Regions:
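Right-hand nucleic-acid polymerase module
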Residues: 1-114, 122-180
């Protein structure tokens, strides 16, 4: 269809299926809720992952594709290692000190290479932003299936929108709520 100058606003809304009375989708609700907390997550991180996992069993060794469960396990392990880098092993493991994380898997719905996006907050005052990249590098070297590339940046206003772009209209499966 074509929108032209002679059309009225109601015609455009009808043709584009705009409904002001429609309930918000899961995607819109999640984005609105997380957007309200975006100031709590001043750092952004993208981690690339190795796309195959080598497994060995009684029949031999084989490669299999990375799955969502693998991504969740890798994210959990990475956050554990990063917490140890930031707070020290004792404080992270025994005292429960942790950064705040909003992890999201990307690539599952779009058939791209699976990778992880994080919005990160709770950085203690003794850790400066320019040190954070080194801490991420050290943590990632201790996690088996994290690839060599990563990107640390200061979160801008569109980061939450960007990392939730694959969240469905009826589900929020891409967000790793268990690590939030």
């Amino acid at each position: 269809f074509c929108i032209n100058k002679g059309m009225k606003l109601q015609d455009i809304r009808t043709r584009t299926a705009y409904n002001p009375n429609a309930l918000p989708t899961q995607k819109a609700a999640v984005r609105a809720w997380l957007g309200g907390m975006s100031k709590e997550f001043p750092l952004s991180l993208t981690l690339t992952l190795k796309q195959t996992i080598v497994e060995t069993n009684d029949r031999g060794t084989y490669r299999r594709a990375l799955t969502r469960a693998d991504c969740e396990r890798i994210a959990r392990r990475f956050t554990q290692k990063l917490n140890r880098q930031v707070f020290g092993k004792y404080a992270a493991d025994k005292c429960g000190k942790s950064l705040k994380y909003l992890p999201v898997i990307e690539g599952e719905r779009s058939n791209k290479h699976l990778h992880l996006h994080f919005a990160i907050g709770g950085l203690p005052s003794h850790v400066k932003f320019n040190q954070f990249d080194t801490l991420v590098t050290n943590a990632k070297l201790q996690v088996e299936h994290v690839d060599s590339e990563h990107k640390v940046d200061i979160t801008d206003s569109g980061w939450i929108e960007y990392i939730t772009k694959e969240v469905g209209t009826k589900d929020t499966d891409n967000v790793l709520w268990t690590l939030f």
